[in-house]
Amino acid sequence: MSILKIARMGHPILLQPAAAIDPAGIAGDPVLQQLIDDMIETLADAGGVGLAAPQVYQGKRLILAIAPEGRADREGAPLHILINPELELTAEPDQVGWEGCLSIPDLRGAVPRSPSLRFHGFDRTGQPVTGAANGFFARVLQHEVDHLDGILYTMRMKDFRYFGFDEELKRLEAEARAAEGQRDDE
């Protein structure tokens, strides 16, 4: 297995729709199986929660998504490998939350997403997969499928006042918590 290089914002592959993968050939395609293994290793190495094939310079409809348990009010979800994923939103995309991206390092932005959805696609053996996702995992799936359609999270943002560097946003958050603590003491 190998850790793959991650494409950064500005590379044209991130703005192009990815090609569907023939479900009949999934299980018997050693190149695709190696790509999946390499993407799993790359995602783990980067410490991310999702990775789409275009982010590793492969214009294929393939994503990985996970929601680790115990990370700040998040329901956990195991690693999902989805080929040709399709999403059906079951609520309006009006829940705003912070997102980052391995292709846009060190930055975060507030993005509206649906808090719930149904998904279907194929697993790495070519078998159909269906399921439902809520909360953070629904957000991750929407973010990754956007990559397959050539959409970056910044393109979904409504207010660029809520966009900035991680370090700066963490500093502002800490200052706000400290100020709130002082008011509680008064």
Where are the model-predicted features located?
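Positively charged
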Residues: 1-186
